From Swiss-Prot:
Family designation: Belongs to the peptidase M10A family.
Record PTM text: Activated by autolytic cleavage after Lys-98. Tyrosine phosphorylated by PKDCC/VLK.
Glycan-modified residues: 109, 464, 479, 521
Entry note: cofactor: Binds 1 zinc ion per subunit.
Source organism per UniProt: Mus musculus (Mouse)
Gene3D superfamilies: Collagenase (Catalytic Domain), Hemopexin-like domain
Region described as Disordered: spans on this chain: 473-500
Protein name: Matrix metalloproteinase-19
Motif, Cysteine switch: chain positions: 84-91
Gene that produces this protein: Mmp19
Disulfide-linked positions: 289-471
Domain remark in the UniProt entry: The conserved cysteine present in the cysteine-switch motif binds the catalytic zinc ion, thus inhibiting the enzyme. The dissociation of the cysteine from the zinc ion upon the activation-peptide release activates the enzyme.
Biological process, per Gene Ontology: angiogenesis; cell differentiation; collagen catabolic process; luteolysis; ovarian follicle development; ovulation from ovarian follicle; proteolysis; response to cAMP
Cofactor: Zn(2+); Ca(2+)
CDD domains with a match to the protein in the record: HX, ZnMc_MMP
């Protein structure tokens, strides 16, 4: 780090065991304080750290760790910094030891899904450990957790290595960072697959305890200054008779309230039921990195969804997400769609197929749907929402219709030629959408077009759709003759049927900052 080199040797007169720390050790200390939120990098000037800022950061860390408070680097402080811990920051900037709150879910009945397991534990032991991790919280707060084995889940748990392409905060190998999690309503929990994950022994890293800690984050709890609390940032080791610390209990109850004793027995019987995967036999599984899509939509939760055949996947900056059966996310929705469009104006998603339309709010079908949609030609090619006039555009062949969801629209003047409004766009597009960057995109075959503010095709387009899907060098290894993703046997992936396809599975967070991937060499298991 260049900004450290100018002052590192002069600013930090730190010693350990009577000897002065070298530049590399000092840099590691500063990196730690910066990484976990004890020290803030100056906004202006690369060498503007003040000695008092670093001293205060060390004092805060020592206080939060239950160490003698000196503001100096000593043996105990150095040892504490080397302990395995959670990857989230410690926003300790107040004197109170009270729990920290990061937000909460707007519902209390949550689903979770286990995507893979480490090589050191069997599937039954992993499942038992994770179920117990959730149960610690549901035993003291009015929360229920239900495991699902396919489709969307509120909380998604997975194991990643150093080179995971779909996890923005990559892990560092054995020791140091053990796991990290998203805040509420994002829902990703990632574990370092290189740790020696164990259960029922003092050796290795106890999966049950670490998972319970990360679930606490996923429910909205920050780190606790009580070193004996589950939500303390540093791993305290295996505890065979573990119970939540009073600070953990107070924090979760501040978010969700107390669990009612009279409903406890009833909920205990139902909270860990599992939901079986969809059993209907789907069509062939597509490769997201080849071929055209049936529809594309910037949908609920700000995620980009691509549809092909009976499957849907999310598109992230790190590549295509997992393939789900469409009906697993939107119950009652068929595959092989003609078009789809999400309207931020009404928060409704409309899907078109033949002469019918399906309407969903989030992932729930509206009453009375599907219904016939005879006001335009059947078998549409594409649809998009245009934020400029808050209208929905429907495309078929070389023409388009402009439809107002909330008002009676006179469609007798349509269709109008696509080229009169969207210059340079091909006829019969397979998909279209307005995206987060405010631009309009059209897709056809293996190409896509971006339009500028004048609704003309931008320079450099069309481009290959693999660029849009962020495939490129991130594309999983494929069989050169079939294009199928090549499986193997390093990790265990859950919730899919045995197949030679789809060995890359990803559930991105709502921010697309933490999504999950499994490298090549995976064994796919039926749920």
């Amino acid at each position: 780090m260049d900004w450290q080199q100018l002052w590192l040797a002069f600013l930090l007169p730190m010693t350990v065991s009577g000897r002065a720390l070298g530049p590399t050790e000092k840099e590691a200390v500063l990196d730690y304080l910066l990484q976990y939120g004890y020290l803030q990098k100056p906004l202006e000037g690369a060498d503007d750290f003040r000695l008092e800022d670093i001293t205060e950061a060390l004092r805060t860390f020592q206080e939060a760790s239950g160490l003698p408070i000196s503001g100096q680097m000593d043996d105990a402080t150095r040892a504490r910094m080397k302990q395995p811990r959670c990857g989230l920051e410690d926003p300790f900037n107040q004197k109170s030891l009270k729990y920290l709150l990061l937000g909460h879910w707007r519902k209390k009945n949550l689903t979770f899904r286990i995507f893979n397991v480490p090589s050191t534990l069997s599937l039954p032991r992993v499942r038992a450990a994770l179920h117990q991790a959730f149960k610690y919280w549901s035993s003291v707060a009015p929360l229920t957790f239900r495991e699902v084995k396919a489709g969307w889940a509120d909380i998604r748990l997975s194991f990643h290595g150093r080179q995971s392409l779909y996890c923005s905060n990559t892990f560092d190998g054995p020791g140091k960072v053990l796991a990290h999690a998203d805040i509420p309503e994002l829902g990703s929990i990632h574990f370092d697959k290189d740790e020696l994950w164990t259960e029922g022994t003092y050796q290795g890293v106890n999966l049950r305890i670490i998972a319970a800690h990360e679930v606490g984050h996923a429910l909205g709890l920050g780190h606790s200054r009580y070193t004996q609390a589950l939500m303390a940032p540093v791993y305290a080791g295996y505890q065979p008779f573990f119970k939540l610390h009073p600070d953990d209990v107070a924090g979760i109850q501040a978010l969700y309230g107390k669990r009612s004793p009279e409903t406890r027995d009833e909920e205990e019987e139902t909270e860990m039921l599992t939901v079986s995967p969809v059993t209907a036999k789907p069509g062939p599984m597509p490769n997201p990195c080849s071929g055209e899509v049936d529809a594309m939509v910037l949908g609920p939760r700000g995620k980009t969804y691509a549809f092909k055949g009976d499957y849907v996947w999310t598109v992230t900056d790190s590549g295509p997400g997992p393939l789900f059966q469409i009906s697993a996310l939107w119950e009652g929705l068929p595959g092989n769609l003609d078009a789809a469009v999400y309207s931020p104006r009404t928060r409704r998603t409309h899907f078109f197929k033949g002469n019918k339309v399906w309407r969903y709010v989030d992932f729930k079908m509206s009453p009375g749907f599907p219904m016939k949609f005879n006001r335009v030609e059947p078998n549409l090619d594409a649809a998009l929402y245009w934020p400029v006039n808050q209208k929905v555009f429907l495309f078929k062949g070389s023409g388009y219709w402009q439809w107002d969801e909330l008002a009676r629209t006179d469609l007798s003047r349509y269709p109008k030629p696509i080229k009169e409004l969207f210059t340079g766009v091909p006829d019969r597009p397979s998909a279209a959408m307005s995206w987060q960057d405010g631009q309009v995109y059209f897709f056809k075959g293996k190409e896509y077009w971006r339009l500028n503010q004048q609704l003309r095709v931008a320079k450099g387009y069309p481009r290959n759709t693999t660029h849009w899907m962020h495939c490129g060098s991130q594309t999983p290894d494929t069989n050169s003759s079939t294009g199928d993703v090549t499986p193997s046997t390093t990790d265990t992936v859950l919730g899919t049927t045995p197949s030679t396809m789809g060995s890359t599975l990803d559930i991105p967070s709502a921010t697309d900052s933490a999504s999950l991937s499994f490298s090549a060499n995976v064994t796919l298991l039926g749920a």
